[in-house]
């Protein structure tokens, strides 16, 4: 690996920008919306039974777009019931965006929000110092387990916080996605850091099996349009390359042979589909619902 290649996570601004481009060029949020519309109502059907308040814990809530979709489904299921929504999110920038979104969203009168600027492990340490652990009716971790050092311990801890009839929802990339193939073949040639792990739903379900937890897993197809990656000097393509490889300025710093090999592979059927002249990377998501 060329020494000039460095992890995308070493430049927060660049990471946020490449992530934004990813969202703009993928069906990631539309895929999540489809799950929230079609599957979530059945999943949360009993979480608030006989309760005067529903407690929801969002781990890595980001800018809140998906969190508010979840809240609207809970409100529809339990009209008028108070909801306590606590958010654990390490990025001050994302929390600020989340608060802006809440401020301009109507129908949140019965929802109390609290934000904690910390990582899931910092939250875990803080909670364990308390004598009594707070129980939750619904806990969700959306696309965040890649940034956790000890995933089985994290799963075990948050599962222990589930109350009666409670559920935990985890969203990660599927083992059938292009990410799985990309990481297995090229992961060792990308910059290594201890901030991010290559995990898919296959790894996660194995961990859940080892922990003896009961869960269901649903896969929904999502794609990312990476056509711009194959246009030399395209700024958008450059940022999507950075996101795909988790490398800062990949096109400028990667060895030419790696860039060429990866460019060829990304157009192969196991990574992407070609449709109407576009190259659509397989971004299939897994939605894992864990029982209390």
Curated annotation (Swiss-Prot):
One of its GO terms (biological process) is histamine metabolic process. The keyword Phosphoprotein does not apply. Gene3D superfamilies: Vaccinia Virus protein VP39. Pfam families: Methyltransf_23. Its main location: cytoplasm. It catalyses: histamine + S-adenosyl-L-methionine = N(tau)-methylhistamine + S-adenosyl-L-homocysteine + H(+). It is linked to Intellectual developmental disorder, autosomal recessive 51: A disorder characterized by significantly below average general intellectual functioning associated with impairments in adaptive behavior and manifested during the developmental period. This is Histamine N-methyltransferase. It comes from Homo sapiens.
């Amino acid at each position: 690996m060329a020494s000039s290649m460095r992890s995308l996570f070493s430049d927060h601004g660049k990471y946020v920008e490449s992530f934004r481009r990813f969202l703009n060029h993928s069906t990631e949020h539309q895929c999540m919306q489809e799950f929230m519309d079609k599957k979530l109502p059945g999943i949360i059907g009993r979480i608030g039974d006989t309760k005067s308040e529903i407690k929801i814990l969002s781990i890595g809530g980001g800018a809140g777009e998906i969190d508010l979709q979840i809240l609207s489904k809970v409100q529809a299921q339990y009209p008028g019931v108070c909801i306590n929504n606590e958010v654990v999110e390490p990025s001050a920038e994302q929390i600020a965006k989340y608060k802006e979104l809440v401020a301009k969203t109507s129908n949140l009168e019965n929802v109390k929000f609290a934000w904690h600027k910390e990582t899931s492990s910092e939250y875990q340490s803080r909670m364990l110092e308390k004598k009594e652990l707070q129980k939750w009716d619904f806990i969700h971790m959306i696309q965040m387990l890649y940034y956790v050092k000890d995933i089985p311990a994290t799963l075990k801890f948050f599962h222990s916080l589930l109350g009666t009839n409670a559920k935990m929802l985890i969203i990660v990339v599927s083992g059938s996605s292009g990410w799985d193939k990309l990481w297995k073949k090229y992961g060792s040639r990308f910059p290594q850091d201890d901030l991010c792990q290559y995990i898919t739903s296959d790894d996660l379900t194995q961990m859940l099996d080892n922990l003896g937890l009961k869960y269901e897993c649903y896969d929904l197809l999502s794609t990312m349009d990476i056509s711009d990656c194959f246009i030399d000097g395209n700024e958008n393509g450059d940022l999507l390359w950075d996101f795909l490889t988790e490398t800062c300025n990949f096109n400028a710093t990667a060895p030419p042979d790696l860039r060429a090999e990866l460019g060829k592979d990304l157009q192969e059927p196991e990574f992407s589909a070609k449709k109407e002249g576009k190259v659509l990377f397989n971004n299939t998501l897994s939605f894992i619902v864990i029982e209390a």
